[in-house]
C-alpha cells in the first residue's frame, strides 16, 4: 500500500473517531499524520464532532489547526452544526478561535438564524454578544427575529430585540415580525413586539396589516391586544376589505363582534388604570360582615346618632369629589383619597330596625348600587364572616351551621372561578408547549426515517441495477461463447471434410496416374515385338474396328486391369464418403463399367443419370473419336498411339464428370449441414433469450416486493 493510500485510510479513521467522540484515537491518528478528509456530504471531522457535542474532540481538532470555516455540501460550517443542536460550550470554543459568524448556508441562514429557529436562547445570546449580524436576511428575506417570532420563542425574541434587531423589517412577502406573530397566534410574542414599539399599521404585499391577518385566522386574543395597542380598523387591503370585512368574509363572528366594539375597547384600554384605582377604593370601603348573634347584641347599645345616615354620606362624597383635582394630577388625588378613607368608610354597627327609615334605605341603596364588583378582578376577598355588616345584606349558613351575613352584591364563587380560569389557561399553555415539543420530535424522527428510507431505496436501486447489468453481461458472454464454439465446431467439421475429400481426390489421381503409366508401359512393350509376330500385331486393330462383339473381347484382352482398378476405386470411394453421398456412389457404379465399354457405346450412354450438357459434349467427342475408325477404309490400320490417346482422354473426361458430381453432392451436403447448424444456433439463442427474460422478470418482481416492504 502506497503512502497516499495509508494517509487516506488514516483520514477515514479520523472521521469515524471524531463522529464517535474517541479522543485518544483522534490524538493518535493526528500524530500518525492523518489529514482532514470529508464525508460524502462534504463534512469534516470538526463538523461531525461539533454536531455530536464532543467538546474534547473539537478542542483537539482546533489545536491541530483544523479549518474553522469549511462548508459542507449544504454550505454549513461547524458553527452552524453546533448551533443546530444548541451546544453552547462548542459555540464558545469556536467563537473564541475566531470563526466566521455570518456565513450563510444554501438557504441563506446564518448560525443566528438557526439558534432563533430552534429557540436556543443561550446560543443566540452568545452569538449576539460575539457580534453576529442581527439584521442578516436569508433567501426568503427573513431575519432571525422573524424566525423566533414564527416559532414563539419569547426569550430569543427578547434577546434579539435587545441586541438591536428591528421589528419593522419586512421579508420578501412584505411581512413584519408582527405579521408573523399574529399569523401563528403567538400572543406573548405580539406583546413583546408591541412593547418594543413595533408599528401596528405596516402592510405586507397583499395590503394586509397584522389586524387583517389575525381577523382572517380567528385569533381573538391577538385582535384584542392589537386593538388595545391602537390598531386602525379602517385600513383597507388590496382586496378593498377592512379587518371587519375580512372577519365576516372568513366567517369569524366573535372576531367581527370585537371589531365592531373597537371604540369601546379603545376607551376601555385608556381608562383601565382609573378603573383599577376605583376597584381598589371600592374594596377598601366595604365593611366586614360579622355573625348575626354579635349584631343582635350590639343593637341595644348603639344609638341612631352614632350611625351616619345616607344623607350625611352623600354630602361627604360630594365634598370629596369637589376636592379631587383633574385626572392629570394623579398623585394629589391619591393622597386626598387616602385622607378621606377614614371619613367615608368608618361605618358603625347596624342601627336598630325601628330607627331605619325607608328613605334612608333607598338612599343607601342608590348610593351603594353603582359600586359593583368587577368580573375580571383577580383579588381574593376575605371570608364573608370577616366583613362588617352592611345596612343591606344577605344571609347564608356557614360550614359550622351558623347563620352568616354577607354583602348583597358579592359572590363567593368568583375568586374560585378566577383561580380555576388562570389554572386552566396555564394548563392549556403547558399542553401547547408539550404538543409543540412532541411535534418537533416527531417531525425530526419522521425526517430521519424518511431520509434513511430514501437512502436505502437508492442503495437497493443501485444494487439491482448492478445485478441486472452483471446478469445481462454474463448472459451475453455465454451466448457469444456458445456461438463461437458452434462456429469453431462447424469450421472444424468443414476442414475435416475438405481434408478427406482432398485425400480421396489425391488417391484417385494417383490411381489414374498408375493406370496411365501401366498402359504406356504395355504400349511400349507391344510397340517392339519380334519380327515373326508383326503380322498378328498389325491385324489386331483391324479386328478392333470390326463389330461390337469383337471390340468387347479385344478390350477385355488388352486391358484386364481397367475393370479391377475402377471397381476397387469405386468401392474405396464409397467407403470413404459419408452416408449422404449415396447418390454419388451409385453414379460412380454406373460410370465405372462405362469406362470399359467406351469404344462400343456412344456419348449419350456414358452418363444417363446426370443429364448434363457436358455428357452431351463428351458423347460428341467420343463419336468424333470413333468416326475415323468407321470411315477409314478396311485396308488402313490405326496406329497404337492414337488408341492410347483416345483411351486417356476418355478416362480424363470420366474422372472430370465424376469430380463434378461429387463436388455438387458435397456442396448440397455442406449447405444442409450449415442450415442445420444455423437452426440449432437460433433455437438455442431463443431459449437463452427466453431464460434471460424470465430471470429479469423475476428480479424485477423481487425489487418491487422489496420496495413495498421498505415503504410499509
UniProtKB/Swiss-Prot annotation:
Q: Which SUPFAM superfamilies match?
A: Ankyrin repeat (SSF48403)
Subunit info here reads: Interacts with AXN1, AXN2 and CSNK1E/CKI-epsilon.
Gene3D superfamilies listed in its UniProt record:
Ankyrin repeat-containing domain (1.25.40.20)
InterPro entries per record? Ankyrin_rpt, Ankyrin_rpt-contain_sf
Alphabetical GO biological process terms: negative regulation of canonical Wnt signaling pathway; positive regulation of Wnt signaling pathway, planar cell polarity pathway
What are the Polar residues biased-composition ranges? 298-313, 598-613
Annotated Pfam families: Ank, Ank_2, Ank_4
Coiled-coil region(s) at which residues?
Answer: 416-445, 669-712
UniProt-recorded name of the protein: Ankyrin repeat domain-containing protein 6
Compositional bias (Basic residues): 362-378, 614-625
Which ranges are annotated Low complexity under compositional bias?
536-556, 626-643
The function of this protein is: Recruits CKI-epsilon to the beta-catenin degradation complex that consists of AXN1 or AXN2 and GSK3-beta and allows efficient phosphorylation of beta-catenin, thereby inhibiting beta-catenin/Tcf signals.
Q: Where is the composition biased (Basic and acidic residues)?
A: 280-296, 316-334
Q: Mark the ANK repeats by their residue spans.
A: 9-38, 41-70, 74-103, 107-136, 140-169, 173-202, 206-235, 239-268
Region entry Disordered, spans: 277-382, 521-647
UniProt keyword list: ANK repeat, Coiled coil, Repeat
| Gene Ontology CC annotations of this record | cytoplasm; nucleus
Amino acid at each position: 500500500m502506497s503512502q497516499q493510500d495509508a494517509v487516506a485510510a488514516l483520514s477515514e479513521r479520523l472521521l469515524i473517531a471524531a463522529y464517535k467522540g474517541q479522543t485518544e484515537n483522534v490524538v493518535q491518528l493526528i500524530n500518525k499524520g492523518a489529514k482532514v478528509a470529508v464525508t460524502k456530504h462534504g463534512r469534516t471531522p470538526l463538523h461531525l464532532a461539533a454536531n455530536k457535542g464532543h467538546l474534547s474532540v473539537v478542542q483537539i481538532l482546533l489545536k491541530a489547526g483544523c479549518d474553522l470555516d469549511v462548508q459542507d455540501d449544504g454550505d454549513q460550517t461547524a458553527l452552524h452544526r453546533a448551533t443546530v443542536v444548541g451546544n453552547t460550550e462548542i459555540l464558545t470554543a469556536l467563537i473564541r478561535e475566531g470563526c466566521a459568524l455570518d456565513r450563510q448556508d444554501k438557504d441563506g441562514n446564518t448560525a443566528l438564524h438557526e439558534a432563533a429557529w430552534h429557540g436556543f436562547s443561550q446560543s443566540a445570546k452568545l452569538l449576539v454578544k460575539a457580534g453576529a449580524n442581527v439584521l442578516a436576511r436569508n433567501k426568503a428575506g427573513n431575519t432571525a427575529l422573524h424566525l423566533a417570532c414564527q416559532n414563539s420563542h419569547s426569550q430569543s425574541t427578547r434577546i434579539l430585540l435587545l441586541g438591536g434587531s428591528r421589528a419593522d423589517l419586512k421579508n420578501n412577502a412584505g411581512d413584519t415580525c408582527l405579521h408573523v406573530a399574529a399569523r401563528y397566534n403567538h400572543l406573548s410574542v405580539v406583546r413583546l413586539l408591541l412593547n418594543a414599539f413595533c408599528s401596528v399599521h405596516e402592510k405586507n404585499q397583499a395590503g394586509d396589516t397584522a389586524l387583517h391577518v389575525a381577523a382572517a385566522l380567528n385569533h381573538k386574543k391577538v385582535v384584542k391586544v392589537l386593538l388595545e395597542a391602537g390598531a386602525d380598523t379602517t385600513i383597507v387591503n388590496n382586496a378593498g376589505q377592512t379587518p371587519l370585512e375580512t372577519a365576516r368574509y372568513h366567517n369569524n363572528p366573535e372576531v367581527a363582534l370585537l371589531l365592531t366594539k373597537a371604540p369601546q375597547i379603545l376607551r376601555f384600554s385608556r381608562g383601565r388604570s382609573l378603573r383599577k384605582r376605583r376597584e381598589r377604593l371600592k374594596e377598601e370601603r366595604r365593611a366586614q360582615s360579622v355573625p348575626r348573634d354579635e349584631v343582635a347584641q350590639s343593637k341595644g347599645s348603639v344609638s341612631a346618632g352614632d350611625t351616619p345616615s345616607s344623607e350625611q354620606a352623600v354630602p361627604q362624597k360630594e365634598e370629596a369629589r369637589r376636592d379631587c383635582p383633574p385626572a392629570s394630577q394623579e398623585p394629589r388625588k391619591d393622597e386626598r383619597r387616602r385622607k378621606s378613607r377614614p371619613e367615608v368608610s368608618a361605618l358603625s354597627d347596624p342601627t336598630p330596625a325601628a330607627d331605619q327609615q325607608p328613605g334612608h334605605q333607598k338612599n343607601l341603596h342608590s348610593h351603594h348600587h353603582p359600586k359593583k364588583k368587577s368580573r375580571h378582578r383577580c383579588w381574593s376577598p376575605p371570608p364573608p364572616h370577616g366583613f362588617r355588616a352592611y345596612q343591606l345584606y344577605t344571609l347564608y349558613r356557614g360550614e359550622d351551621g351558623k347563620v352568616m351575613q354577607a354583602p348583597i352584591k358579592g359572590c363567593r364563587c368568583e375568586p374560585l372561578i378566577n383561580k380555576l380560569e388562570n389554572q386552566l389557561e396555564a394548563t392549556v399553555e403547558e399542553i401547547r408547549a408539550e404538543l409543540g415539543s412532541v411535534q418537533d420530535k416527531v417531525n425530526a424522527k419522521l425526517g430521519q426515517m424518511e431520509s434513511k428510507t430514501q437512502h436505502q431505496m437508492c442503495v437497493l436501486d443501485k444494487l439491482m441495477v448492478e445485478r441486472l447489468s452483471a446478469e445481462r453481461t454474463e448472459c451475453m458472454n455465454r451466448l457469444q461463447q456458445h456461438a463461437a464454439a458452434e462456429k469453431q465446431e462447424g469450421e472444424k467439421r468443414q476442414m475435416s471434410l475438405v481434408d478427406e475429400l482432398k485425400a480421396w481426390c489425391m488417391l484417385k489421381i494417383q490411381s489414374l496416374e498408375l493406370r496411365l503409366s501401366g498402359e504406356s508401359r504395355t504400349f511400349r512393350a507391344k510397340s517392339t515385338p519380334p519380327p515373326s509376330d508383326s503380322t498378328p500385331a498389325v491385324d489386331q486393330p483391324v479386328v478392333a474396328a470390326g463389330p461390337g462383339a469383337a471390340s468387347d473381347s479385344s478390350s477385355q484382352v488388352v486391358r484386364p486391369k481397367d475393370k479391377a482398378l475402377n471397381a476397387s476405386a469405386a468401392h474405396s470411394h464409397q467407403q470413404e464418403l459419408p452416408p449422404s453421398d449415396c447418390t454419388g456412389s451409385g453414379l460412380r457404379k454406373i460410370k465405372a463399367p462405362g469406362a470399359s465399354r467406351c469404344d462400343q457405346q456412344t456419348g449419350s450412354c456414358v452418363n444417363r443419370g446426370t443429364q448434363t450438357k457436358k455428357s452431351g459434349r463428351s458423347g460428341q467427342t467420343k463419336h468424333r473419336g470413333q468416326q475415323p475408325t468407321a470411315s477409314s477404309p478396311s485396308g488402313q490400320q490405326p496406329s497404337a498411339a492414337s488408341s492410347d490417346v483416345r483411351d486417356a482422354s476418355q478416362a480424363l473426361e470420366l474422372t472430370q464428370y465424376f469430380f463434378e458430381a461429387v463436388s455438387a453432392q458435397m456442396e448440397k451436403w455442406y449447405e444442409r449441414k450449415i442450415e442445420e447448424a444455423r437452426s440449432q444456433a437460433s433455437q438455442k439463442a431463443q431459449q437463452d433469450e427466453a431464460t434471460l427474460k424470465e430471470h429479469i422478470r423475476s428480479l424485477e418482481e423481487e425489487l418491487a416486493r422489496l420496495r413495498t416492504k421498505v415503504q410499509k
